[in-house]
């Protein structure tokens, strides 16, 4: 009888364990990756070299206003749909163009990684997809800009600067990454700059 009770008790534990949601294998969403202000663009190569690709470049690589030199708002990274799998899907910002009889636009959050913005354009041809792109450019830019702002703050919090020049000289507390260095320090002027070899910060 004791053995029977032990067996029944073991079965009860097994049943409870199997029905416990926390014990089931849950999908693990990886961390997103990519440089700041970089967007992965997924479409057929012919479309990328044609009108649709030009439309994406015109809308998302417009220069910032007020700078003495042209710096695009976003850097674009082209991906062929054939390689859009695995690690390639972990980009933080994605424009995904798909040929489909059901024409629609969708904004997906954390679809393949976290944090992530995926703008999905479906249409019978490039013209339909370009229409949805133009209609939603403002929303997409706002979403990506906010996504990048959060990512910048996360990176700053991981490696904040230890320089105290601003605090000592002007009583100003400013948090910025260690990648930025003081390159000029005078009586009433401090110049902080991030060294770059690409001509822009994207």
Residue locations for each model-derived region?
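C-terminal motif of bacterial Sec signal peptides marking the signal peptidase cleavage site
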Residues: 15-17
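N-terminal targeting sequences that direct proteins away from the cytosol to non-cytosolic compartments
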Residues: 19-201
């Amino acid at each position: 009888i004791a053995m029977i009770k032990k067996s029944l008790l073991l079965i009860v534990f097994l049943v409870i364990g199997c029905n416990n949601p926390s014990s089931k294998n849950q999908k693990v969403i990886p961390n997103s990756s990519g440089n700041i202000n970089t967007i992965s663009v997924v479409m057929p190569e012919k479309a990328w070299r044609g009108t649709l690709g030009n439309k994406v470049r015109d809308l998302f690589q417009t220069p910032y206003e007020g700078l003495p030199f042209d710096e695009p708002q976003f850097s674009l990274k082209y991906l062929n749909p054939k390689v859009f799998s695995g690690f390639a899907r972990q980009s933080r910002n994605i424009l995904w163009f798909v040929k489909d009889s059901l024409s629609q636009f969708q904004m997906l959050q954390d679809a393949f990684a976290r944090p992530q913005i995926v703008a999905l354009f479906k249409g019978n041809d490039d013209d339909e997809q370009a229409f949805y792109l133009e209609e939603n450019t403002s929303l997409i830019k706002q979403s990506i800009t906010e996504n990048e702002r959060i990512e910048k703050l996360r990176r700053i919090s991981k490696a904040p600067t230890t320089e105290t020049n601003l605090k000592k000289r002007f009583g100003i507390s400013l948090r910025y990454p260690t990648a930025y260095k003081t390159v000029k320090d005078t009586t009433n002027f401090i110049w902080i700059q991030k060294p770059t070899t690409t001509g822009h910060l994207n």
